[in-house]
């Protein structure tokens, strides 16, 4: 999920992705190759194993790590995410509560989409079962969820049509591939 979202948003925003070494190296060398229902192309964006100092003032941080890694990710980037907008785009329940211990600006997100690894820095999107959903945790939608507009601006297609997206309350389910990401407008 993380590298795919970073790739799609790199066309409309400045993006840095924090990824495992093999993926970060591959993205730096040849970009991320994406195929499937969201289109085909090679995407180039900033990617490394850690968050460079220049990226610590991002508009949004998107966490797509496995639920079991949420607290470790939050601890690793605690100084960067404190007081910042943090989007939880992860499998599992309870991620928003964990993130909420590190920032009071948590956005829950849900995406029911199948992302398939086709090699290092190569992803195939084969299924989209529902629109992406975003919502302020724990209260639902508010005007600060401008990330919804940023996500809508990313050129994500579903069978040749723009993907749909809704902003609503707390997320109970979503899908991820164990990477940490963030988006900057």
Label every model-predicted segment.
Residues 10, 28, 78, 100, ...:
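Class I S-adenosyl-L-methionine
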Residues 175-177:
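Oxyanion-binding "anion nests"
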Residues 56, 90-171, 182:
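Rossmann-fold dinucleotide-binding core
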Residues 19, 33, 77, 143, ...:
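Flavin (primarily FAD) cofactor-binding/catalytic cores of flavoenzymes
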Residues 39-123:
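Rossmann-like NAD(P)(H) cofactor-binding subdomain of soluble oxidoreductases
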Residues 1-36:
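NAD(P)+-binding Rossmann beta1-loop-alpha1 motif at the extreme N-terminus of oxidoreductases
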Residues 17-20, 63-64, 88-89, 137:
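Active-site-adjacent beta-strand anchor residues
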Residues 185:
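Interdomain hinge/lid region at the active-site interface
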């Amino acid at each position: 999920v993380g590298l795919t979202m970073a790739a799609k948003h790199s066309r409309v925003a400045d993006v840095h992705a924090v990824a495992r070494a093999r993926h970060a190296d591959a993205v730096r060398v040849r970009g991320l190759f994406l195929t499937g229902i969201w289109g085909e192309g090679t995407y180039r964006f900033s990617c490394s194993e850690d968050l460079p100092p220049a990226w610590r003032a991002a508009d949004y941080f998107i966490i797509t790590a496995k639920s079991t890694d949420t607290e470790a990710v939050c601890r690793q980037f605690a100084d960067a995410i404190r007081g910042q907008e943090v989007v939880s785009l992860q499998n599992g329940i309870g991620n928003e509560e964990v993130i909420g211990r590190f920032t009071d600006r948590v956005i829950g997100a849900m995406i029911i989409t199948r992302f398939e690894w086709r090699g290092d820095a190569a992803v195939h999107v084969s299924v989209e079962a529902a629109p992406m959903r975003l919502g302020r945790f724990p209260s639902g939608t508010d005007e600060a969820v401008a990330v919804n507009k940023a996500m809508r601006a990313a050129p994500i297609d579903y069978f040749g049509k723009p993907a749909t997206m809704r902003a609503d309350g707390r997320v109970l389910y979503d899908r991820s591939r164990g990477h940490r990401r963030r988006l900057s407008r």
